[in-house]
Amino acid sequence: DLRDFKKLGRPRLFFGISPGCMDSMVNKYTANKRLRSDDAYTPDARPDMRPDYPSIVYTQILKKLYPDVPVVLGGIEASMRRVTHYDYWQDKLMKSILVESGADLLIYGMGEKPVVELIRRFNDKRLSLNTIPQIAYLCKTTDFISEEGDIRLFSHAECLKDKKKQAANFRHIEEESNKYTASRITQEVDGMTVVVNPPYPPLTEAELDHSYDLPYTRLPHPKYKGKRIPAYD
């Protein structure tokens, strides 16, 4: 039943998908790969409210219902899967979540700045989305133009053949994620290139205050009225 995906109608700019403040698979399964008995973030702690890999599932559904509407991923699940990554649950290397899901863009890390800039550029059709810091996107490898200073990771196919190449990739990702001035990261997969733009600098104190002083209700969704959500308690 896909009616819930249509209740809000077609968005003016894009669909934004983030499964929550904790990796959905860690939240759903134990380290022994058994289904958890409860979920701290769902009404009445039900453990069956979300599918496996919800970013992928939700994106694929939205692309079927609204194929011409962009989908932007964000949150922990997408951030940790922006390039080739080891999936504990399937015990294998998986491609970028952009490939697996079919999403158009991915915002990684804390998204206060990139999401505001993304909306500004969606509203101004003259501006490119692909130069926004702290986003990742896919393009055809034949159309990709490298830049000086780019870090080219081993391709997904190379990582499948040699685990040391995946380890080398992971080192680059970790180093660039923690630099004040980072490099752009690229990786080839299935004739496409994943491009990960360097992040914004850390927010200033004033920027943090502005973000957290917005008029959030800090309440559960009204749909869950009368139901207990453990994390909110």
Region annotations inferred by a language model:
Residues R184-T193, Y212, P220-K223:
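Short acidic (Asp/Glu) and glycine-rich catalytic loops that position anionic groups and cofactors
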Residues K225-D233:
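N-terminal pre-triad scaffold of radical SAM enzymes
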Residues D1, K6-K7, L208, L214-T217, ...:
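Amphipathic repeat-derived elements
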Residues E100, L203-K225:
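Alpha/beta-hydrolase fold catalytic core
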Residues L2-D190, V196-Y200:
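Glycine-rich beta-alpha loop elements in corrinoid/cobalamin-binding modules
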